[in-house]
A protein has these predicted regions:
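Core subunits and conserved enzymes of cellular information-processing
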Residues: 2-220
Length: 220
């Protein structure tokens, strides 16, 4: 078996112009992805594993999901800056501060049209469309090569440290931890969570080559 790939990298040689271009693409991906997250949340049928954790914390703290999202990601980012090297990039900072407000904005836009009182067909469609949009946005973020969110870095850092364990098992362990803690705190676990667990990965894999080609065509 060959040496397992690690994820830390040095991007210090990038020009300012390249960073601006990459960060704009990442921001576009964040907007798309968090629209998907919002559709999951509004369906009240469960959401992705990390958002279950954030939702549970928000109910305990009495704060919006977006506000708690920013607080938790900033805490994770500071911890990573203090204990690791090469993982936190400019895009990580953008993810930490922008994701929460985007969720709150889309929640404000759509909460009157999609909610727990909506018909079940509307809520199920919201989950399915949300999963497709979330995975599309994630593929754009990945192809931006500008960094990723602190929540995703948890599994990445652990994978690099625990060299004998495959990344997928570490990711599944992190997902199980977040969803279990979120459920204990009052987050909604439901059919949407199951859909997110089993469909998000394959759909991201479906979108990755397509968004890569598109971004190459527009020279991003």
């Amino acid at each position: 078996m060959g040496k397992k790939q690690t994820f830390a990298s040095d991007t210090s040689q990038r020009s300012i112009t390249d960073w601006i271009r990459a960060l704009l693409v990442l921001l576009l991906g964040l907007i798309i992805a968090h629209l998907g997250v919002t559709l999951f949340l509004l369906s009240a049928l469960g959401t992705d594993t990390f958002t279950v954790f954030i939702q549970g914390l928000s109910r305990v703290a009495g704060l919006s999901v977006g506000t708690v999202h920013v607080i938790v990601l900033c805490m994770l980012m500071v911890l990573m800056l203090l204990t690791t090297k090469g993982y936190v990039k400019p895009g990580t900072i953008v993810c930490a501060f922008c994701g929460g407000p985007i969720i709150d904005f889309f929640t404000w836009c759509f909460k009157e049209y999609i909610n727990a009182s909506s018909g079940m067909p509307v809520r199920i469609i919201s989950v399915l469309v949300g999963c497709a949009i979330l995975s599309l946005g994630m593929s754009v973020v990945i192809n931006s090569n500008a960094g990723t969110g602190p929540n995703d870095l948890v599994a990445i850092i652990l994978s690099d440290k625990l060299e004998r364990i495959e990344f997928r098992w570490i990711r599944m362990g992190c997902d199980a931890f977040f969803v279990s803690l979120g459920f204990i705190l009052g987050g909604t676990v439901g059919v949407g969570t199951i859909i997110a667990i089993f469909l998000t990965g394959p759909m991201v894999q479906f979108w990755l080559p397509k968004t890569k080609v598109l971004l190459q065509k527009i020279r991003v």
